[in-house]
From Swiss-Prot:
It comes from the Eukaryota. It catalyses: a ubiquinone + NADH + 5 H(+)(in) = a ubiquinol + NAD(+) + 4 H(+)(out). One of its GO terms (cellular component) is mitochondrial inner membrane. This is NADH-ubiquinone oxidoreductase chain 1. It comes from Pelomedusa subrufa (African side-necked turtle). The chain crosses the membrane at residues 7-27, 74-94, 104-124, 144-164, 176-196, 227-247, 257-277, 298-318. It is an enzyme of class 7 (translocase). The gene is MT-ND1.
Length: 322
């Protein structure tokens, strides 16, 4: 019985995330169609609600195509690796209870998101296509660059809260949201999450006019669906993390139901911001993308982090501790 429970618990944790990801794709298509003078998916099921199921079945039953000169083993493993790493980033998330309650939950999350770079790089290299390789190199350079900013912002927030555990942020924000005391960091964090998840206007990795489709150009069927789900899982995870860091979803002693509803509502609102930005802004040039980080975000986040450290030292203050 205990073995069965150990198997069912991760499944019960992962399955709602995958369902949310599938319906988020439908919401994206509906929102973008509303922002343009056209209808979205409205044929499959009532109001098009069965469209994600139809898309998933179509992709799963398509025959996967493997390029002749590709590294077949690596070509097959990388989509599975990408989806597994994207799902593993949810493990320390309090939803309201985490599957794995880690004292260094933020470090674990940052490490897992950093490892996703390897799945992108290996998929581009294993495809044996110049377009896939160039898209992979672009994506890796972009992801690694913006991880520096994300890490520095997380360090500043840890100095505010006093720990790497997700629950310490709830204690810190019992009186006031951290977005009010650190709004420049919140603004840079939100823009950096757009770049980290390869979303418009920073979707340089899949520039259709230059690279056909980026690092996943040779993938079809199930492996393509795995990459697609990994990307959208990362989007929802980043927005959930943004909610926990800057917009306290519930007080420490709130009921789990209210906490979950508050967390989901705020995360969905932030995710809708991603869709709005995609429908509004054109794609940046690659040099503008890099200049934004290295010439603007990096100096500001470094200065802000040093300011937080000096503030604690000069006032002999310590952050709140559980």
């Amino acid at each position: 019985m205990s073995i069965m429970m150990n198997l069912l618990q991760p499944l019960a944790f992962i399955l709602p995330i995958l369902i949310a990801v599938s319906f988020f794709t439908l919401v994206e298509r509906k929102v973008i169609s509303c922002m343009q003078p056209r209808k979205g998916p409205n044929i499959t099921g009532p109001f098009g609600l069965l469209q994600p199921l139809a898309d998933g079945l179509k992709l799963l039953f398509k025959e996967p195509v493997y390029p002749t000169n590709s590294s077949t083993t690596l070509f097959i493993l990388t989509p599975t690796m990408a989806l597994s790493l994207a799902l593993s980033t949810w493990l320390p998330m309090p939803l309201p209870f985490s599957l794995v309650d880690l004292n260094l939950g933020l470090l674990f999350l940052l490490s897992m998101s950093s490892l996703m770079v390897f799945s992108i790089l290996w998929s581009g290299w294993a495809s044996n296509s110049k377009y896939a390789l160039m898209g992979a190199l672009r994506a890796v350079a972009q992801t690694i660059s913006y991880e520096i900013t994300l890490s520095l912002i997380l360090l500043s927030m840890v100095l505010f809260s006093g720990g790497f555990n997700m629950r310490t942020f709830m204690t810190t924000q019992e009186q006031i949201y951290l977005i009010f005391s650190s709004w420049p960091l919140a603004m840079m964090w939100y823009i950096s999450t757009l770049a980290e998840t390869n979303r418009a206007p920073f979707d340089l990795a899949e520039g259709e006019s230059e690279l056909v489709s980026g690092f996943n150009v040779e993938y079809a069927g199930g492996p393509f669906a795995a990459f697609f789900m990994a990307e959208y899982t990362s989007i929802l995870m980043m927005n959930t993390l943004s909610t926990i860091l800057f917009l306290n979803p519930g007080f420490m002693y709130t009921s789990p139901t209210i906490f979950s509803i508050s967390l989901m509502t705020t995360a969905v609102a932030l995710s809708m911001g991603f869709l709005w930005i995609r429908a509004t802004y054109p794609r940046f040039r690659y040099d503008q993308l890099m200049h934004l980080l290295w010439k603007n975000f990096l100096p500001i986040t470094l200065a802000w982090c040093l300011w937080h450290i000096s503030l604690l030292v000069t006032t002999s203050g310590i952050p709140p501790m559980l």
